[in-house]
């Protein structure tokens, strides 16, 4: 059998797919030719198969370096469910397990061994010397670079692999890395003339929405409405601080939403319990800092919310990528405020890589403030261009309309000028709104002519307009002067009537009916691939129930048994024999034999 046929047969037998995704076949051939590679492929794009399939076709064991125990566990469970011999050598195992794993590796009974960078360095002169290693795969390779968004010092020592095992190919894989990070990965791993494979970063199934200027109460209200519209679907809420994860989670729990908390300040046991509860659908939502998610291979996360502005587009892209890994429609929402920008600017200014971190934050700010297709901005950041708008972001769905906002801008700039440019955003809004706050009265600002000049505009709208003014360059924030606002020359031109200012009309989500009642926006939930009707939905729910039952029996996450996408395909195809069941994309030989009878028997009840 030639190599192409062997690759396709292995793909179908173990993973249940009839064809490769873009770049997968090319990458696999390159690795089988014992060549080094750097693979950039978006989350859910099929990175794992790029090294798992070569591992099955080569003699020996593939060693996969992974940063998190949870990520290893997820990958190993998925491989075992596909009938592939795999194991993870890490500190969560007892000594007996690790002894058995070492023996299996030396005897060549494992096709893939997952290992942490620390464990790999400890074993490089012992276990690895005694193994027949087919290839090294460095997962989450951006962790090696100080320019990456998730730098981990222990990864920097991975460069010893090529020195100690020069004949063994190395493939480094990541979902996000800009040019400087890619170059750093290649340099630090000492990759030998590697080929760099970059797949499309486009995730057309993920919708992109930005909400600007929301205060905490408004955010919480909007989040509750969003979660209720999504029914019982799984989602993640990312917060900037540990304290905020706790307060948001408590708010959701009081509303009866099954929600957990995850951040670095919690014990390992607590974090593991939260992660396991989320993976196994015992909780619906996780409120987390950026510490959460890399180890999550959960394919049916349907939404991601950023409570605060992320520090970079890489971080943002990686985190929204945790939604919709199965390719089904998923939603993401980013809340953005000037307070976030000020705090993140302070952090970036105090960091070791001040210039580059400020530049990354500025690009994130440009994304959040954009009035052109957001997906085009994301793709452009990673060096990918497209001539078409996506149609699946808030800008495309509701193109911005502009109006003459000169008077609004003049009111704001006049208030800044009358306080001798010694006020922050919050105090400016208090003055414009006519709020007798302690700071306003303490400085006598209630006597200003502009005090209360903007009381007809709600605080949230002022936040949005001020963000627009900042973006248009009418004022700057002096971060080194207590975040005071400074009028620019462009701002002066508007203030003194030399030029006009166009602002974007603020679009509020809630429409109002003639009777004055708020009308909720309803998200239409449809079965993909053309399935429709109540009967299909009934079958889908029955299949989910059976999947959960089988998963509970094996103590596995439900999506490892079969993904939501496979369940939808079963709803459409409705196989009535085990052979037909095995023809469904995503069902390999092992799953066909293991689960075919149970699922076919259930489907027959709906067909007959």
Where are these regions (language model features)?
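Short helix-to-turn junction characteristic of helix-turn-helix DNA-binding domains
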Residues: 31, 227, 278, 368, ...
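Short, charged low-complexity linear segments at domain edges
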Residues: 353-382
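Accessory DNA-binding and partner-docking regions appended to nucleic-acid-acting proteins
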Residues: 1-7, 356-358, 387-608
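Flexible coil/turn residues that form the inter-helical turn or adjacent wing/linker of helix-turn-helix
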Residues: 166, 231, 371, 421, ...
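Helicase motor core with emphasis on the C-terminal RecA-like subdomain
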Residues: 3-14, 18-22, 26-48, 56-58, ...
């Amino acid at each position: 059998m030639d190599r192409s046929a062997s690759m396709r047969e292995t793909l179908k037998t173990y993973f249940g797919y009839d064809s490769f995704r873009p770049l997968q076949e090319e990458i696999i051939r390159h690795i089988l030719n014992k060549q080094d590679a750097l693979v950039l492929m978006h989350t859910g794009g099929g990175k794992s198969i790029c090294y798992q399939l070569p591992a099955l076709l080569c003699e020996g064991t593939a060693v996969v370096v992974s940063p998190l125990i949870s990520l290893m566990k997820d990958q190993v469970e998925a491989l075992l469910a596909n009938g592939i011999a795999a194991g993870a050598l890490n500190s969560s195992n007892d000594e007996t397990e690790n002894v058995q794993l070492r023996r299996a590796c030396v005897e060549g009974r494992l096709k893939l061994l997952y290992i942490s960078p620390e464990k790999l360095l400890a074993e490089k002169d012992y276990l690895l010397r005694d193994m027949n290693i087919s290839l090294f795969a460095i997962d989450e390779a951006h962790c090696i670079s100080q320019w990456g968004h998730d730098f981990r010092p222990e990864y920097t020592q991975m460069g010893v692999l090529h020195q100690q095992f020069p004949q063994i190919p190395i493939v480094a894989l990541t979902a996000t890395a800009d040019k400087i990070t890619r170059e750093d990965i290649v340099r630090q791993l000492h990759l030998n003339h590697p080929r760099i494979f970059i797949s499309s970063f486009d995730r057309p199934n993920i919708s992109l929405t930005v909400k600007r200027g929301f205060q905490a109460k408004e955010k919480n209200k909007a989040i509750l409405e969003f979660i209720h519209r999504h029914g019982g679907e799984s989602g993640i809420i990312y917060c900037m601080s540990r304290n905020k994860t706790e307060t948001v989670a408590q708010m959701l729990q009081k509303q009866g939403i099954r929600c957990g908390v995850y951040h670095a300040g919690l014990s390992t046991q607590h974090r593991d319990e939260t992660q396991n509860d989320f993976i196994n659908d015992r909780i619906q939502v996780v409120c987390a800092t950026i510490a959460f998610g890399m180890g999550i291979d959960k394919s049916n996360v349907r939404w991601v919310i950023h409570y605060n502005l992320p520090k970079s587009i890489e971080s943002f892209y990686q985190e929204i990528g945790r939604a919709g890994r199965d390719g089904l429609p998923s939603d993401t929402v980013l809340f953005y405020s000037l307070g976030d920008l000020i705090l993140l600017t302070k952090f970036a200014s105090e960091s070791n890589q001040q210039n580059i971190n400020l530049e990354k934050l500025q690009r994130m700010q440009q994304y959040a403030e954009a009035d052109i297709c957001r997906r085009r901005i994301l793709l452009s950041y990673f060096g990918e261009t497209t001539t078409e708008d996506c149609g699946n972001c808030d800008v495309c769905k509701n193109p911005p309309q502009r109006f003459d906002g000169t008077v609004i801008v003049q009111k704001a700039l006049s208030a800044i000028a009358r306080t001798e440019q010694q006020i922050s955003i919050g105090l400016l809004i208090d003055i414009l709104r006519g709020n007798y706050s302690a700071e306003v009265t303490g400085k006598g600002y209630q006597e200003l002519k502009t005090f209360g000049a903007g009381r007809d505009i709600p605080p949230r709208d002022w936040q949005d307009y001020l963000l627009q003014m900042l973006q248009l360059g009418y004022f700057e924030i002096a971060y080194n002067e207590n975040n005071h606002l400074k009028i620019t020359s462009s701002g002066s031109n508007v203030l003194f009537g030399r030029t006009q200012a166009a602002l974007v009309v603020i679009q509020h989500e809630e429409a109002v009916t003639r009777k004055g009642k708020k009308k909720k926006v309803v998200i239409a939930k449809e079965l993909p691939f053309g399935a429709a009707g109540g009967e299909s939905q009934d079958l889908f729910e029955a299949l989910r129930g059976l999947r959960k039952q089988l998963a509970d029996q094996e103590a596995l996450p439900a999506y490892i048994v079969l993904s939501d996408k496979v369940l939808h395909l079963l709803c459409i195809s409705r196989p009535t024999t085990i052979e037909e069941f095995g023809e469904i994309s995503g069902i390999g030989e092992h799953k066909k034999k293991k689960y075919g009878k149970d699922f076919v028997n259930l489907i027959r009840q709906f067909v007959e």
